[in-house]
Amino acid sequence: MTDAEETLLVGYRYDGHGDMVQTTDARGVSKHFEYGKGHLLTRLTNQGGMAFHWEYEGEGENARCVHTWGDGGVMEYFFEYAQGVTRTRNGEGAVSEYHYDSDRLIYKVVDANGGITRKQYNAYKELEVTVDPEGNCRKTEYNRYGLPSVITDANGNTTLLTYDGDCNLTRMKTPGGRVLAWDYDTMGRLTARTGPDGQKTRYGYEGKLLRTITDGQGRTYRLTFDDRYNLTLMEYPNGLFRRWSYDRRGRLAEEVDVKGNATRYGYDEADNLIRLEEPDGNTHRFEYDAMGNMVHAQDGIREVRFTYGALGVLKSREQERHRITFGYNSELQLKRIGNEAGEDYRFELDGLGQVTAETGFDGIRREYERDGAGNVVRVARPGGKWTRYEYDGEGNILRELQYDGEESLYTYDKDGLLVKAGNGECLTELVRDRKTGRVTEERQGGHSVRSEYDKEGNRTRVTSTLGADIRHAYDRDGYLQSMQAGEGWKASWMRDSAGLEMQRTCSGGITVRTERDRFGRETRKSVRSGSIERGAWKYEWGMADRLLSKENELTGTVMRYDYDRFDFLIRQETTKGSATDVIYRVPDFVGNLYGTPERKDRKYGAGGRLLEDAECIYHYDDEGNLVFREFRQPREDAVRHDRRRMEREYGIRRPVTDMGWIYEWTSGGMLRRVVRPDGRSVEFRYDALGRRTAKQYLGKVTRWVWDGNTPLHEWVAAVTDNDGREEASCPDGNSLTTWIFEEGTFVPAAKIRGDRQCSIVSDYMGTPVQMYDSEGNRIWDCTLDIYGKVTDFRGESLHDCPFRFQGQYEDVETGLYYNRFRYYDAEIGCYLNQDPIGLTRRLSVYGYVCNSNLLLDIVGWHGNSLDNIADSRLYEIKINGILFKYGIATEKYVTKIDITVVSPNGTSHIIPKGTPTRIKNQLRKAYANYDDVTFDSQPYKQISTFKMREIESKKIKAYVELTQKVPSGNVDHARRGYGVLADDFSGVHDLIKDLKMKNNLHISNDIH
């Protein structure tokens, strides 16, 4: 930028006393400051016109603030000062006390709930001991430089830290004995990082710039910068490139991905992004208010408007007259969510802002009792039901007890990794590698599954006590290259330079070829058995990854799809010859689905409960679980259920026909039993991780052994008594089915039963469409509609392959799809009970994903998009040498300019343009509050969100004891049902030990 091109970014104006009274940004919007005696700030009026005020006692250097507030009483605080103690009271009436000694070190904090936290310091004023209100004690020892050297957590486990002469952290040994190490050059720059598995990542510099990153397998990433130190090119180990270019102010102007697709950016004077042009031609435009909050967003498909309250809290989101509102208390803590139908979801908070009660859109109320550390120890549920929890000193759940005596117990190793999970059905034991914490053996009752890994952590072999022996091989870039089961079934993959599958070859002479467009989307998939084409599908795509049509080239069947402006898939038109069939999936304001465009074929209640359709009336219990699906008209093949019993046990009143499906639930929220219309029962059992272990029907029981989150073995045995005991604990070879999934995914690849080996072909969504035997014969062919319901099938038995949308297993006995933590009904397009993770994903707690052509719900938690593929980064932030946060970030959204942040000691830190937005947000907070902040990240090319979360999970677990608790930057995520402390064997980002609580808690404590 030349002098003639200079642009005013911020202007400052001062009064005659030297006090700054106004700042003006590049758009001409100003903040105003007013002062009292002694240069004391008394009023600040922000760009939106809202004012904040300060009142003081005393004058000059002795002046102290006694009252501060924003207009309308927002963020109001009163301060009282006494000898050795300061008291604060906020606008909600919550009072806290801070007691300090003669050195002005706080030694006791009395929080707003009356809990007392005590602190103890050494002679150098370093914090040595912290005891929380529950008596949990954490201790820290320091070296002569004041750096933590020994940290002992509340469970008594110790982490050891070692530093070099320049005070750089060089080694960390966790309580479980796992070791991480770091190397530095003479300038204090990180040159190598060694993980617990011994794999070393190296960093190379030229001058001041980082030029190369080389992983443990010798793969090198090369970085190029322009003369302004902007990253302009990244070369991947396989020769692919990503490019960035910038405007004259250093803002990102264009980004070109590895396939040559360009994304362009435009900005206003204040560097707000106002235009984004995607490679597919979709252009996004954005508008902002004076505070920099986005108030209007529009692209070629959607238009959304936002309004804001004090300090930028979101008050409403409106799209096509669909309005969601948010209400807050004076602390700006979320108290209410109003949905599009005018229903409210409300929260009650204690003095610390923790949720103590919540009332759903449907009026269901839950109350939460917490201990002094904030852990939920009791959930009071509707109908007098309750759940209790017990914890160790680090907040890990040890015991979950339900009101009916149902109990789950959990055990952890010294690093806080789950090693046992048991309930009345099954004990699961996880044997972990001492160095890495990876699960090497999982014992489930009398069976076990063992895993072996290569140096990169890729799983190379899976064996079981029931005879499974599955081997995986990977290519130079770490992508799955081949799988083999014993000496029989085999599959191999050929990929493009970005790692996307182009061809798969399976046993029986099966070849699956995939063609893609420049965005990596499938445009054609074909299946050949020998030289004969047995399957061929063609896909047409529109903007925003909307599938417009799918054609089965062999049958001539064409499916065309329509969408609304909310990204809902609303219509499927199927044409075959002269016949045309149309299926509707039309949502109302809150996402409830209808089968007609007029939306008069169904009736819904508050909170999205389906109450009636043309065939049935739906009855629910007091927790929102479906308990009776009653036929409107009597049926000859149905029995009448006992009306008194239904009212007594299920709370069903005024039934019409007494005929239909009855659903019974465990106290933990899992489906326990289904009574069919013919009076026969289907019963289910689960382990402590929510995995189904047994299904009993007509004197036979189906058993499963799991490999993490996917079933590995399945067999059927005869029941010999009323307790469901089987005639044999182990199946013979001919009755045992072994399922093989593509490693690290939920996509089935093969079925082995006895000597019969079958290859499974799936579409671009991972939904099985065909199956072939070892001779290359097509034995199973299935087509689903937009609800996931089977519309066309050819083969011996539909149940030969029971998998539908990813993560779903169809039960022929009930017609339901088991979806890990819930059951999905493809007839109506929704789940039987509410989402265990509540509002985390979406306000519709019964609904499936809005677009089944694009999104997945793998474990029954609404709208998982874990299969999305993108370039991503795993990052870590350390504060004062201690891990603050591990996280993942997609490189799809990055900063457009260099961002300068000044730390408390006045040091300026630059967050360079091109930094992923998620990383930018974390660094901005860290730099603004701490002087000693270090940052590092590792790129991953074209990787799924699922896999990135798995990698993140493993990293956090290896480091979890550094602060003797969850790293503070990860605490919020750990409280979510999809939290970052996933057991790495499970693959999904779920802390299962927390999930059992979330089944009742609905994690509302995380919403605000």
Give short role names for the model-derived ranges.
Residues 629, 771, 789-791, 822-832, ...:
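Short, low-complexity export/processing leader segments characterized by acidic and small residues
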Residues 862-1008:
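Catalytic toxin/effector domains delivered as secreted proteins or via bacterial secretion systems
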Residues 589, 599-605, 750-820, 853-855:
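A motif-centric feature for acidic-aromatic and gly/ser/thr-rich catalytic loops and repeats
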